[in-house]
DNA sequence: CCAATAGTGTCTGTGAGACAGTATCCG
DNA sequence: CGGATACTGTCTCACAGACACTATTGG
């Protein structure tokens, strides 16, 4: 019964990589090639290795799956999931990380045999393996909250972007429509949120928009609060 | 080298139990009786057991250390700490939980040989074993944020409390002074925050104050935002 | 009466939301 | 010129903070 006091287990690190593509919030998923849940969609992840920090493991998985530099991207710990029966192979506790990426040209330059692809969150939110549906739900809610209180929305965009691009991120992630004029005033007035680059982008139609880059601020004071506290299933 | 792919480790669950006592934010700490960091202060915790969920383990530790029912108290997962060298005994990853308790008469009715006691956060914030200083910092910051956006402050109080008691919680946790009149209006007007019991409490001096119990709401709309974004080390 | 705490009413500045109006591109 | 998008100005309402004032106890 010393086993009760000293349970040995394996620790997995799973990734929820979110982006905004084609006007939708999308998540990077893989199709499982092996044993449990074979053929099912799942979040990318892997086991923690010796000598590795949790964040290091998350960054390593991120590179393996998307060829993205985890040290540059936004990457934050989400939560840890440890229900005894969450993995049929045995006791596996999973630390989930939330990553935010701009719209990448091709997601899967990975080396793994498993195919990786972007999928709209709405399309896969109930079809993932393990307890990944719950993890994805928690990740989306975290991202929505981060948009309220931090400058995270700029990470969804590329290195330079217009105020309209930034507004588009908010509208897609929150699933709302925002007044472009009020949003512009709000964002420009918030110190450290965005910095003008001096250049402009000429759209197919309409007046050219000023291009910005992300500012130095991390937190938003005051925050951009959502009107309704998100009551969508 | 299969060891690199399948690292086995032990998972600990550590608790940050906060309360407001004697006008200070205090945390429950134990004095370590055994091997690493013997005699040093540390957060209470223990290893995950077979068949146990993470939250179950946290509730079990909570009962062992404080004889409090973890199912009733506020208990939320804080974060997971997994630096390779965080525990001299070997690879141990720790899932930290944040618990909020009202001012208890005696903290240590626990069975463990280790002595448990309340200590002001300020007094122990740099003297804890392992990486518990960092965990404590994160926990306090989480609690401060929770007070802004949830009705968590009522959990610091007993089953019934006055508006002044509730204000006292905010003032101690945030380390600020609040206008009693504005605070009262704000709290009473927020639907679901507090419910009148119809009874009153007679203080040593002054007008009797109405007693309330916690309301049904969990989230605060709108939130009670701190003025300054906490720049204390 | 005074001291002390509880609670109400009022003013003011700030910011969000609504929306008219102006600016600048393409065709 | 019209169509479309970017951006500015103005109004209104709600709320946070400051603070005068009233209410209710004990001594």
Model-derived segments and spans:
Chain A
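Active-site-adjacent beta-strand/loop module that shapes the phosphate/pyrophosphate-binding cleft
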Residues: 23, 83-106, 139-142, 210-219
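NUDIX/MutT-family hydrolases
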Residues: 96-99, 107-143, 147, 156-164, ...
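N-terminal strand-loop-strand
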Residues: 2-42, 55
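Short, P/G- and charge-enriched loop/turn segments at secondary-structure junctions
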Residues: 1-5, 83-86
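Short, solvent-exposed loop/turn elements at beta->coil junctions and helix N-caps
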Residues: 79-86, 199-202
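Core RNA-modification/binding signature centered on pseudouridine synthases
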Residues: 9-10, 16, 28, 33, ...
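A short catalytic or substrate-binding loop motif that flags glycine-/basic-rich loops and adjacent residues
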Residues: 6-11, 89-93, 204
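The catalytic Nudix box helix
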Residues: 48-76, 97, 166
